[in-house]
Amino acid sequence: MREGRLYIDNRDAYIDFGVWITRGGYDGLLPFPELVEPDRNDWPDEDGIEPDLEKPTLKPRELNITFVRDVDGRSAGDLVEHLSKSGYHLFRIPSLGREWSLRLIQSPAYEDWDTLEAFTLRFAEDQPVRPSSVAIPEGRAYVPPSEYELDGVPLDRYGVMVTEGRDEIMRSPTVKTNLSRTVLDVDGRIYDAGKVVYNSKEVTLKCCLIAGSMTTFWSCYDALLDALIQPGERSLYVDYNVEEYPCYYKRTSGWKLESLRGRVVVTFNLTLEFTVFRMDGVDYLLATEAGELVVTEDGEYYIDLNIYA
């Protein structure tokens, strides 16, 4: 049954235009908006960067939706003609429980499947929707305790487990280039090797969000996006190496809706920019006999036991 799966401007897409969305066609609707790259100071003699995150802003989104129609049915031109009318068009998908206001920016690329024809349209979402007043959910019912915390909140609270990330976390950043000079009649170059400092680095975590219902999924989805785009730097704590990294959200990619039946399962990649990263030895922090780190009375800082000359 293809009726009632997609509504465009409150019109049933199958009944009125003879089209439906192909399997996997929902994936393009899911990615978080990308963050506009913030202004930054990149001091040549200091590790990392100082980004201006006082007021993070989001980029408009562009996305593809692939439709299918019967070759013997109505022409795809009916849908394209409707979407070519001025203004935005409201896409509502009942099974996802959400709607999007989109603008057509590219007409179809066609692909024949015997008795079916697939065509892909590209849309813009000019004003991505920011979540507002989102409480942190208890989405951990279907995922194990997380080794990662975002601003002190374990990712399993958002229903998220990180399936790959250790190699990305431990990968060393590139070294900043110091002052150098070449002389025409001298081999090689003269390089200031007096100090080694590191660039910031991008880290991509492969994630899986699992929820018991679409309502819970959107609650976790909105809460995670809201947490990522708050003003200021984020803090990513990694349990397996007892390190906390200053960072900020950049983008997501590779969203795939794996399951809508029973549990909702979605996989995606989360990319963060680590503003400062240096692996320069062992840090010693005060802990209890049970291995729990001791924090200061205000709950903001660990107690450093390193000896500094």
Named regions from a protein language model:
Residues M1-A309:
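Extracellular/virion structural assembly segments
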